[in-house]
Amino acid sequence: MATQTIEGSSRSGPRRTIVGDLLKPLNSEYGKVAPGWGTTPLMGVAMALFAVFLSIILEIYNSSVLLDGISLS
């Protein structure tokens, strides 16, 4: 048998900690979904702004567009 229980073993339930007690209310909404689109448009805007940010960083790194007229030395 792969698993075996030992008779008379004292195994208590999960330990209660201060951090666990503080974080418990945050997990009380688990599984509940807000009706409609919720914050999806906000996430879309955030993703678009992040894509613009990454493209600006890439352009600076490649010295392709933003730094054409600037000498670095």
UniProtKB/Swiss-Prot annotation:
GO terms for molecular function: phosphate ion binding. Signal peptide: none annotated. Phosphorylation is a light-dependent reaction catalyzed by a membrane-bound kinase; phosphorylation occurs on Thr residue(s) in the N-terminus of the protein. The keyword Chloroplast applies. Keywords: Chloroplast, Membrane, Phosphoprotein, Photosynthesis, Photosystem II, Plastid, Thylakoid, Transmembrane, Transmembrane helix. Pfam families: PsbH (PF00737). GO terms for biological process: photosynthesis; protein stabilization. It is a single-pass membrane protein. It is found in: Plastid, Chloroplast thylakoid membrane. Gene3D superfamilies: Photosystem II reaction center protein H (1.20.5.880). The keyword Membrane applies. InterPro entries: PSII_PsbH, PSII_PsbH_sf. GO terms for cellular component: chloroplast thylakoid membrane; photosystem II. The chain crosses the membrane at residues 41-61. The modification Phosphothreonine is found at T3, T5. PSII is composed of 1 copy each of membrane proteins PsbA, PsbB, PsbC, PsbD, PsbE, PsbF, PsbH, PsbI, PsbJ, PsbK, PsbL, PsbM, PsbT, PsbX, PsbY, PsbZ, Psb30/Ycf12, at least 3 peripheral proteins of the oxygen-evolving complex and a large number of cofactors. It forms dimeric complexes. Belongs to the PsbH family. One of the components of the core complex of photosystem II (PSII), required for its stability and/or assembly. PSII is a light-driven water:plastoquinone oxidoreductase that uses light energy to abstract electrons from H(2)O, generating O(2) and a proton gradient subsequently used for ATP formation. It consists of a core antenna complex that captures photons, and an electron transfer chain that converts photonic excitation into a charge separation. PANTHER family: PHOTOSYSTEM II REACTION CENTER PROTEIN H (PTHR34469:SF4). This is Photosystem II reaction center protein H. It comes from Nymphaea alba (White water-lily). The gene is psbH.
